[in-house]
C-alpha cells in the first residue's frame, strides 16, 4: 500500500465539483461524514484570504458589541499569507485591531520572547508590528522561567485566557511532518 500520496494529489485532476460544492445540498452530501468542517481551496492564497476574511468578520462583530476578539496565533511560516492579507485589510480597508487580544500559542524553552529566534518575535515581525494592536493586549509564554514553575505558569496562562472569555479563533501552523 502506498502512503504519503498528498504530494501526488493535484486539484487540476479533480473536478471542482468534489471540493467546491455549488450549493448547500451539495455541500451537505460532500461533508456528511466529516467531524470537523473542512473547506478545500485551489490555492494557498485563496485559502489564506478566506481565513483572513473570517478573522476580520469576527473582529468586526466583536467591535460592534464592544467586546475583545481573542486570537491565539503562531509565528510559524504556515500563516504568513493570512497575516499578509490581514495587514492589507488594516492598511487599505481600515480594519482595526484595537479590540484584539493575542495569545502566542507557544514559545521555545529556554528562550526569551524578544530573542531573535523566538516564536513571539517572529509573530511580531510578520504581523503584530504592522497593525494597530495595543501592546498591552499581547501575551506570550515566558521561556525564561525556572523549570520547577512551568506547570503553575501554564495554569496561570490558561486562567488569563479564560479571564478574557476564552479564545475566539486559534490559527495553527502546519509543519511538513504533519505536526499541528
Description of each model-found segment:
Residues 9, 19-35, 95-169:
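Ligand-binding beta-strand-loop-alpha-helix segment within the catalytic cores
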Residues 52-60, 87, 91, 124-128, ...:
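Generic structural signal for well-ordered alpha-helical scaffold segments
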Amino acid at each position: 500500500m502506498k502512503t504519503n500520496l498528498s504530494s501526488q494529489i493535484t486539484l487540476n485532476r479533480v473536478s471542482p465539483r468534489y471540493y467546491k460544492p455549488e450549493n448547500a445540498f451539495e455541500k451537505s452530501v460532500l461533508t456528511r461524514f466529516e467531524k470537523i468542517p473542512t473547506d478545500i481551496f485551489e490555492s494557498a492564497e485563496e485559502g489564506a484570504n478566506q481565513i483572513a476574511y473570517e478573522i476580520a468578520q469576527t473582529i468586526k462583530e466583536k467591535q460592534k458589541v464592544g467586546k475583545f476578539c481573542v486570537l491565539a496565533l503562531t509565528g510559524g511560516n504556515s500563516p504568513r499569507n493570512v497575516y499578509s492579507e490581514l495587514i492589507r485589510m488594516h492598511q487599505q480597508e481600515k480594519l482595526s485591531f484595537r479590540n484584539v487580544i493575542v495569545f502566542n500559542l507557544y514559545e521555545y524553552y529556554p528562550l526569551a520572547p524578544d530573542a531573535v529566534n523566538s516564536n513571539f518575535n517572529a509573530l511580531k515581525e510578520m504581523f503584530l508590528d504592522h497593525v494597530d494592536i495595543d501592546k498591552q493586549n499581547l501575551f506570550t509564554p515566558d521561556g525564561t522561567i525556572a523549570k520547577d514553575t512551568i506547570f503553575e505558569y501554564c495554569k496561570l496562562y490558561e486562567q488569563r485566557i479564560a479571564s478574557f472569555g476564552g479564545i475566539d479563533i486559534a490559527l495553527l501552523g502546519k509543519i511538513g511532518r504533519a505536526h499541528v
